[in-house]
Amino acid sequence: MGIETEFGVTCTFHGHRRLSPDEVARYLFRRVVSWGRSSNVFLRNGARLYLDVGSHPEYATAECDSLIQLVNHDRAGERVLEELLIDAEARLAEEGIGGDIYLFKNNTDSAGNSYGCHENFLVARAGEFSRISDVLLPFLVTRQLICGAGKVLQTPKAATFCLSQRAEHIWEGVSSATTRSRPIINTRDEPHADAEKYRRLHVIVGDSNMAETTTMLKVGSAALVLEMIEAGVSFRDFALDNPIRAIREVSHDVTGKKPVRLAGGRQASALDIQREYHAKAVEHLRNREPDPQVEQVVDLWGRTLDAVEAQDFAKVDTEIDWVIKRKLFQRYQDRHGFDLSDPKIAQLDLAYHDIKRGRGVFDVLQRKGLVKRVTEDETIDDAVENPPQTTRAKLRGDFITAAQAAGRDFTVDWVHLKLNDQAQRTVLCKDPFRSVDERVERLIASM
């Protein structure tokens, strides 16, 4: 599993000189380019850091094989970007450009642009992809009910609270495009592994989450549904009449009870659909090896659905992003008498996703103990420096660390490790589960 996160970037200036988003992004990545000779690099912890289309910094975690490991490495991405932010602000100050840089782990900006949080799952090549997409699509359309990041949407009539930031920007169900049409599931076949054994399922519909528990639920529930599909579990047919209309309808309904149209004229609510998937997950747990992390996911999944059904969120208001955010807005409105259309609510919405510690609203809530965690600061710090020790990422991270220490010129990607010397020595690592490889050890020893 892995998560790719694009960050929103902006800068407020104290003086007269202004910088475009492109220029701000270049300041952010100046330190990266100075050592990596590129704005597209792999790090010692196995992750990829690069400047994506539209001046959005993007962090792709290393391959992870457990949910807690993935959450730690996702949070490590925030720390890596925060370091770049602090360094860039110092450079601006040195050049007499007073300004504060903001990086937001969200999915929309004030101009209506959207940027993503993509989940990657390694699935077996065997079997029909259409079965995966048929079962997964209704799940993903309604999953925002349990793991949306929440958003205040300004409409011509009034401001309204929505479950998902990403839902309004999705235009296809299944497609090979990522930016033009923004599908729910991307079918571009780039397994980054042995293509005869595996395919990489690329889910681009999810919101960027701040709460660790929500990230764990988002990825863990999807991974469990995929596991059940591969195990041959049968699901009720929830094929949607129009997934693009449905995803918006679900996002606008915090009760989860409004019916969406299914194929053939049937109807079901988001709550109905999620209840079915959750019930199958509970049943599946009885037949699989015990895993406390997966059990934690299924427990939170069920509690969140119960909270939505009862419209009583007290038992999940420290664990689910959209619930945390909605409670924050309601308290702010009660205190100041604002309605949702007030610019200060929009400002609070954005500040929730500010990744700078001590400034971002989510970080303030976390420091006050108002959101639940599954990591420790120490484990996140470790993930900033070190790759997962149980996947191929360890080979990549060890190789990069050794090559940098030896001052060697090298090239890496997800599957290749290459020393750029006269011999052009390259090792191909096609097994994402393999963390020990004699060929890589010999390559490192040769430096």
Swiss-Prot record:
What are the transmembrane regions?
A: none
Q: In which pathway does it act?
A: Protein degradation; proteasomal Pup-dependent pathway; Protein modification; protein pupylation
Asked whether the keyword Chaperone is assigned, the reply is: no
The GO terms describing molecular function are: ATP binding; ligase activity, forming carbon-nitrogen bonds; magnesium ion binding; ubiquitin-like protein transferase activity
Where, by residue number, is the active site? 52
E.C. code: 6.3.1.19
Query: So what does this thing catalyse?
Result: ATP + [prokaryotic ubiquitin-like protein]-L-glutamate + [protein]-L-lysine = ADP + phosphate + N(6)-([prokaryotic ubiquitin-like protein]-gamma-L-glutamyl)-[protein]-L-lysine
Annotated binding of Mg(2+), by residue: 4, 50, 58
Q: Which residues bind ATP?
A: 48, 61, 414
Q: Does the keyword Transport apply?
A: no
Q: Name one GO biological process term.
A: modification-dependent protein catabolic process
Q: Which domain of life is it from?
A: Bacteria
Report the Pfam families cross-referenced here: Pup_ligase
> What UniProt keywords apply to this chain's record, in alphabetical order?
ATP-binding, Ligase, Magnesium, Metal-binding, Nucleotide-binding, Ubl conjugation pathway
Remarks, anything else? Answer: The reaction mechanism probably proceeds via the activation of Pup by phosphorylation of its C-terminal glutamate, which is then subject to nucleophilic attack by the substrate lysine, resulting in an isopeptide bond and the release of phosphate as a good leaving group.
Report the NCBIfam families cross-referenced here: pupylate_PafA (TIGR03686)
Q: What does this protein do?
A: Catalyzes the covalent attachment of the prokaryotic ubiquitin-like protein modifier Pup to the proteasomal substrate proteins, thereby targeting them for proteasomal degradation. This tagging system is termed pupylation. The ligation reaction involves the side-chain carboxylate of the C-terminal glutamate of Pup and the side-chain amino group of a substrate lysine.
* Stated family: Belongs to the Pup ligase/Pup deamidase family. Pup-conjugating enzyme subfamily.
Please identify the protein, giving its name as recorded. Pup--protein ligase 2
Organism per entry: Rhodococcus erythropolis
Q: What lineage does the source organism belong to?
A: Bacteria, Bacillati, Actinomycetota, Actinomycetes, Mycobacteriales
